[in-house]
Amino acid sequence: MSMKRKKIVIGIVVFVVLATVSLLIANTIAKNKLKDYIVNLPEHITIVYDDLDVSLLQGNITLKAPLLTVKGKTTNQVNAQVKLANLDIKGFGYWSYLFNDKLKFEALNFETPLVTYYHNPLADTDQGSQSVLKNIKKALYIKNLNVNEASVKVINVENDSIIFSTNNLNFLMTQISINDDLDIKTLFKFKSSTVSANNLKYQV
């Protein structure tokens, strides 16, 4: 092998090694930033999960077996819980997040979520919804939000009765955005939505 060819081979090897190391470092930085964001949610909102997978090249993130719990700010009682098989995020805009502090996703997929909401007639549910979304504290854009095969149960806390339930619920919402331009009464904007479900039960 000639000296010129050796230099070319060495240069290629060095480039591949540097690119791989840089990718691993960037991947670790992005993963740690996401972990910090989850840890630093408001006290009444918690997310626990089994594992967090990040693929920088594909822009994909998977939270394995996450459990979201939302409590009342004053009562400290559980208002809602969402348990999923997986939360899959596709096409995450890392550079928008790292440098512009903006959350941007091509798709957000909730796989087989089990949703339990504890309805309190005396509570201000609209205020609670605003609290969760406003606490995101970042500009947010989601091209497609998919909920696949969800089970939903709404429980009346006054008598522990089930006032609403359904299973195999599928939901799609497109072009969702949250930013500082929205007025206080508007939680978010979206373009379209579709929903289907089985075994819908409602207590009048």
Please tell me what each predicted stretch does.
Residues I47-L122, S131-E158, T174-Q203:
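Flexible beta-edge/linker motif
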Residues S2-E43:
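N-terminal type II signal-anchor transmembrane helix
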Residues A30-N40, D124-T125, S129-I136:
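Sec-dependent signal peptide cleavage junction
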